[in-house]
Amino acid sequence: MPIPLKPIKLIALSDQYNFVIASDECYSELWFDEAPIGLLEVCAEMGRDDYKNCVVFHSLSKRSNLPGMRSGFIAGDAALLKPYLQYRTYHGAALSVQHQLASIAAWNDETHVEENRKQYRAKFELFQTELGHLLPLKKPNAGFYYWLKVDNDEKFARLLMEKAHIKVLPGRYLSRETEHGNPGENHVRLALVADLEQCKEVVKRLKAIL
């Protein structure tokens, strides 16, 4: 895969102005067609083995459907990680031994991650096929949720809860008010995290009220 131009330009700006690039890559393993290239991979391709000013964050919450595990890691510029480790030592909460053992098992296994991707492909295909004519569904390139444009996000979320017992999150709750308005307003986050059979039931209920 060729190196994307955007991170190369961003790294050049980081060198010029000395700012840190913190890349949230917790969704990086939930792709559909081709795996994305990560920030540290870009650094390596550029010959930047010190990963200067670059750090990445990974988590089990998305790749393994384990948001409650609170297990993840940060990697990158050692000069940044040293003070971060000290901060984490004094301000972070240690995982129990049981959680650490479960985390090791999850990090060492890729089979369930591949199955996870397969399941999300099937769920998105289900929604596109069954609801594409009823809702403005735009399939993302990766991830597990739709960012759906609606007339009023709070009213739409309330309608789905009252009429179909389906919970979605109003987009305005994910952002803040600015002088230009709320960027999440009139969008809803529709996450396909339930299993395929439950998603089929969701589709059935949505078709009944839309």
Tell what function each PLM region has.
Residues 1-210:
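PLP-dependent class I/II
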